[in-house]
Swiss-Prot record:
The keyword Ion transport does not apply. The modification Phosphothreonine is found at T177, T429. Residues 260-383 form the CoV N CTD domain. Residues 9-23, 193-227 have a biased composition (Low complexity). RNA binds at R109, R125, R167. The gene is N. It comes from Murine coronavirus (strain DVIM) (MHV-DVIM). This is Nucleoprotein. The modification Phosphoserine is found at S162, S170, S194, S390, S425. The keyword Transcription applies. Residues 64-193 form the CoV N NTD domain. Residues 50-61 have a biased composition (Polar residues). Residues 267-384 are annotated as: Dimerization. Residues 56-197 are annotated as: RNA-binding. One of its GO terms (cellular component) is host cell endoplasmic reticulum-Golgi intermediate compartment.
């Protein structure tokens, strides 16, 4: 008895037979379809049998097997496709845990030409196949194969192949890929069809596909108009948009005085308890100067606010809204409503007191203690007891510069020293010594040497 994904009861194995390469999927071009060029049209020709691994040509990109699930597309270069152990198997109704094993197959898609004439390679897309099915049906679980990543449920037996039927696209549509809660999707990848509108449009897409199947059967003998839409055209457009965004995103964003002022004003317009200080609106502008009642924040953290690299680890200690209301002592106090001329309004303050408890087993405990010790009561170690923001230097006008010049001109200059005073510090020559000895013998001291008693 074989299992059919998406059905509660197991069904019999179905055969895909000879089908046209375009299948019945209307909204998505899957990797198992031939990516045809715009000039290769099948209008007026009979349907060709599905290509296999031995019959597919080198031109184009063909995967000769139909996956039960939508693909996972890479949108960032240099990212590795991988899942943690026990994760990565898509969810499908009717498939027991013992059969949830298989591999993700990398489909290397074709390249396209951009409007400026450059050749762009579309990033690969990955498809899931159950163990014993798909392009590597004969491989053993865990074999080292280029472009294959093995995944399995923790309850699955990877020594035996899965008893899953192969998908017939004429009978079964591809299932949107979903994973068990807690599964971490590889970084740089997204699930096809996982947009915001995907859940709401599933029921509509099923009814539309049923109606389109009936119309296709009734008009199978009629000539179908040629489509002017190339396969993966949406992906080409998306790639162009991503390339454009990536180019623009690489340029540094310039913050002007006007934009910084707007950000600061936007923050200050919020209630005090909703403000988030940052570089544009530092801590003191949001909450006032540091002191006994607001005693946290060193000089660096006061400038950067929540942009400080050390702040995220402190945020781990912050209580949740539930812990704030249910784990604190709260007191509602009515405040004075202001001056006599101001309109009357009731002002209240919700006073709270509580504690945040942690111990040395907390991850990053030493770093947290270091940051706390540097910022608690840091205002006491600063000049004046509080952190005062130094005023901006004012530009000097021409008048102020002239006044400054006049002040310099009026400054009295000290009288220069006498020649003897200027020479006191230099070394004495033999002639100086002889003259000095003669002066001492005569008892006559020249002017300027009366105070030099040590000479």
């Amino acid at each position: 008895m074989s299992f059919v994904p998406g059905q509660e009861n197991a069904g019999s194995r179905s055969s895909s037979g000879n089908r046209a390469g375009n299948g019945i999927l209307k909204k998505t071009t899957w990797a198992d379809q031939t990516e045809r060029g715009p000039n290769n049209q099948n209008r007026g020709r009979r349907n060709q049998p599905k290509q296999t691994a031995t019959t597919q040509s080198n031109s184009g990109s063909v995967v000769p097997h139909y996956s039960w699930f939508s693909g996972i597309t890479q949108f960032q270069k240099g990212k590795e496709f991988q899942f943690a152990d026990g994760q990565g198997v898509p969810i499908a109704n009717g498939i027991p845990a013992s059969e949830q094993k298989g591999y993700w197959y990398r489909h290397n898609r074709r390249s396209f030409k951009t409007p400026d004439g450059q050749q762009k390679q579309l990033l690969p897309r990955w498809y899931f196949y159950y163990l014993g099915t798909g392009p590597h049906a004969g491989a053993t679980y865990g074999d080292s194969i280029e472009g294959v990543f093995w995944v399995a449920n923790s309850q699955a037996d990877t020594n035996t192949r899965s008893d899953i039927v192969e998908r017939d696209p004429s009978s079964h549509e591809a299932i949107p890929t979903r994973f068990a809660p807690g599964t971490v999707l590889p970084q740089g990848f997204y699930v096809e069809g996982s947009g915001r509108s995907a859940p709401a449009s599933r029921s509509g897409s099923r009814s539309q596909s049923r109606g389109s199947n009936n119309r296709a059967r009734s008009s199978s003998n009629q000539r179908q108009p040629a489509s002017t839409v190339k396969p993966d055209m949406a992906e080409e457009i998306a790639a162009l948009v991503l390339a454009k965004l990536g180019k623009d995103a690489g340029q540094p964003k310039q913050v002007t005085k006007q934009s910084a002022k707007e950000v600061r004003q936007k923050i200050l317009n919020k209630p005090r308890q909703k403000r988030t200080p940052n570089k544009q609106c530092p801590v003191q502008q949001c909450f006032g100067k540091r002191g006994p009642n607001q005693n946290f924040g060193g000089s660096e953290m006061l400038k950067l606010g929540t942009s400080d690299p050390q702040f995220p680890i402190l945020a781990e200690l912050a209580p949740t809204p539930g812990a704030f209301f249910f784990g604190s002592k709260l007191e509602l106090v009515k405040k004075n409503s202001g001056g006599v001329d101001e309109p009357t309004k009731d002002v209240y303050e919700l006073l709270y007191s509580g504690a945040i408890r942690f111990d040395s087993t907390l991850p990053g405990f030493e770093t947290i203690m270091k940051v706390l010790n540097e910022n608690l009561n840091a205002y006491q170690n600063q000049a004046g007891g509080v952190d005062v923001v130094s005023p901006k230097p004012q530009r000097k006008g021409r008048r102020q510069a002239q006044e400054k010049k006049d002040e310099v001109d009026n400054v009295s200059v000290a009288k220069p020293k006498s020649s003897v005073q200027r020479n006191v510090s230099r070394e004495l020559t033999p002639e100086d010594r002889s003259l000095l000895a003669q002066i001492l013998d005569d008892g006559v001291v020249p002017d300027g040497l009366e105070d030099d008693s040590n000479v």
